[in-house]
């Protein structure tokens, strides 16, 4: 009896170890190339609108994949999908490294990496629920969450060091480390019974087309792309109303509180992601810092602060309530952007503090947005609704990166608007920061109103 129990515990612990490895590298893959975007732009002689697709391509397939893998898990089995994700992620890494001298191949490789990496966040939580005993799940989720935060933290530092001292292309090989988990997962994960079901492939294709063409519009500003995107989304909406098992539940669209909360959350996440993608360009143009200095000295402290702010935010929600935390988070974000706009050419360490403010504000607002959205859902809508929120969060990050890249390239905001004496190289960035602050304030006011109304109706 004791031997059987100890063997079962050992098996669960081994599963948890390899899940932690996958979780860490999935986030690292997302963050590690961000600091190298200016280097990539210079090497290929590309504008930020094109160079940012190195991250946008990954986030696009990553966001769609996270939604798709969850729906496929019962039909194809978690074990098969995890192994598929690991191998595809590794394949994308090798293609990217071998063909890194050709920009189209690099973008293709990032699309492939996103397809593979999406399996990890989508399925890891399901594996914990199925394989880890109920009494240990809290610790398991906590450990995975800590490693995810660590991956977000060390990603920019690793990216900066490797890009500066070796070459950014070697960062593409980092995800291949997950291949070491394959033999252990094959041995540890049980074979599952498959459940027959229907996958709304038409809905997935229509929605993906709408997203891709909208992102292409934000980077090229060709209105033909916008028209195609609108048509694709229109057909998609008509489709999900008639489909037997639609990719997105159309009933969620009738929930005004849910829709507004999700859209505002997406705007905030996209704004912060766009800001983080802009920081390397800004620090190179204004302060002429190296990639290593930007990664470890500017972005790294902010990403690591997420661990502390996440804990503080959780305590404050319990003690002071969601509205209090929302206001503090929005204040940190908007004030951080405004201070950066007015002191953009001051000492670089000021930007380090601002990045800490921004990531702290993001931690606080993420908690509140999840609370607002979940409180607007009925019990039967909770699963589909929260999955759609996660999908929107990932997608908005990629969209934010694409939009910021487009704005940095067209020079629309490259004019002096603030009454301060600064160098011409700062005009574009300071105006972008003012725009970011405005978006945050508007979202704060809207979410505040939605939260109060949902509480009144709840």
Swiss-Prot record:
Coiled coil: none annotated. It is found in: Cell membrane. The keyword Cell membrane applies. The keyword Ribonucleoprotein does not apply. GO terms for cellular component: plasma membrane. One of its GO terms (biological process) is response to antibiotic. It comes from the Bacteria. The chain crosses the membrane at residues 12-33, 81-100, 111-129, 140-162, 165-185, 201-221, 223-240, 256-276, 297-317, 324-344, 346-365, 432-451. It is a multi-pass membrane protein. Keywords: Antibiotic resistance, Antiport, Cell membrane, Hydrogen ion transport, Ion transport, Membrane, Transmembrane, Transmembrane helix, Transport. Resistance to tetracycline by an active tetracycline efflux. This is an energy-dependent process that decreases the accumulation of the antibiotic in whole cells. This protein functions as a metal-tetracycline/H(+) antiporter. Belongs to the major facilitator superfamily. TCR/Tet family. This is Tetracycline resistance protein.
